[in-house]
């Protein structure tokens, strides 16, 4: 299958006092170049994932890196067979990745970056505690061998988990953390460093860079890596895995999941059926009908 869409996952922490002034120019450029996805702007920097033609993404990256505050953004590229986003959004936020703890600043203190080629040696060290900083539904479909799953629903819950498990953290000399693209670990390692832990490490470029650069036969990764777009998940080589999302709870679904009697497209799946009321499901049905209608209108407008 031909992959025509270039996907860029990017972030950069910076002292960006004028972030509000960047919203309109970024949105205008993306709309002019038919780029779709989401970019978040805050005083602490920029974060997001976007997709478009190769030339369009290059133009956007050139625009972003021309901003003096964004001289060295972390950018990971991959490809998609179809546009993985429905629209373009540039949002203003308090944080570019929400931890909810004031004063955590990766520009001041952060963990030691570990290149993918050196990651296996670190996490196989008996003195290393390996922590997956992602959400529970992400861990459920793939992670590194031996990683601790904090079982959090959102990244906001991570600081409380750390405080609750400090005794476990102190049992090991080293703490290694990882996430999808690296940004959550910028915050999590900065937070743990502020608590007084010194030997704190994180995977440079995140899981995506590891899966891109480490051959499957040498890998300590099992399963798939959840991504926050219509590809849903990727595997070694950043190949798409063919999953879909439950539109009610955003859990990743495979073919077997869709055979469940609790699965209804756009409405429910095994993971959320018992947590929703019938009123909720009826609301989701109406939302799904409206979504399908909007897709039909978009198709007709392109044909005219």
Swiss-Prot record:
InterPro entries: Rhodanese-like_dom (IPR001763), Rhodanese-like_dom_sf (IPR036873), TrhO (IPR020936), TRHO_N (IPR040503). It catalyses: uridine(34) in tRNA + AH2 + O2 = 5-hydroxyuridine(34) in tRNA + A + H2O. One of its GO terms (molecular function) is oxidoreductase activity, acting on paired donors, with incorporation or reduction of molecular oxygen. Keywords: Oxidoreductase, tRNA processing. Its EC number is 1.14.-.-. One of its GO terms (biological process) is tRNA modification. The active site is at 179 (cysteine persulfide intermediate). Residues 124-219 form the Rhodanese domain. Belongs to the TrhO family. Catalyzes oxygen-dependent 5-hydroxyuridine (ho5U) modification at position 34 in tRNAs. This is tRNA uridine(34) hydroxylase. The gene is trhO.
């Amino acid at each position: 299958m031909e992959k025509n869409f270039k996907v860029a996952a990017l972030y950069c922490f910076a002292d960006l006092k004028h972030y509000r002034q960047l919203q309109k120019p970024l949105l205008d450029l993306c709309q002019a170049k038919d780029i779709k996805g989401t970019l978040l702007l805050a005083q602490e920097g920029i974060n997001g994932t976007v997709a478009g033609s190769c030339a369009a993404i290059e133009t956007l990256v050139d625009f972003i890196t021309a901003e003096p505050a964004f001289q060295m953004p972390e950018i990971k590229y991959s490809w998609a067979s179809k546009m993985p986003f429905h629209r373009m959004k540039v949002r203003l936020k308090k944080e570019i990745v929400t931890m909810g703890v004031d004063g955590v600043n990766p520009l001041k203190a952060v963990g030691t970056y570990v290149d993918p080629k050196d990651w296996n040696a670190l996490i196989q060290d008996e003195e290393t505690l390996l922590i997956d900083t992602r959400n529970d539904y992400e861990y459920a479909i793939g992670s590194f061998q031996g990683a601790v799953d904090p079982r959090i629903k959102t990244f906001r819950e991570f600081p409380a988990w750390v405080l609750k498990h400090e005794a476990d953290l102190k049992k090991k000399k080293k703490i290694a953390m990882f996430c999808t693209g690296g940004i959550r670990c910028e915050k999590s390692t900065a937070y743990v460093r502020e608590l007084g832990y010194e030997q704190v490490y994180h995977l440079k470029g995140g899981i995506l860079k590891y899966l891109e650069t480490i051959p499957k036969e040498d890998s300590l990764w099992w399963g798939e890596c959840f991504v926050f777009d219509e590809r849903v998940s990727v595997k070694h080589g950043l190949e798409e895995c063919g999953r879909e999302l439950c539109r009610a709870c955003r859990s990743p679904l495979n073919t077997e999941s869709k055979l469940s009697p609790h699965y209804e497209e756009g409405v429910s799946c095994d993971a959320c059926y018992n947590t929703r009321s019938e009123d909720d499901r009826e609301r989701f049905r109406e939302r799904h009908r409206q979504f399908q209608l909007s897709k039909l209108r978009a198709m007709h407008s392109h044909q005219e």
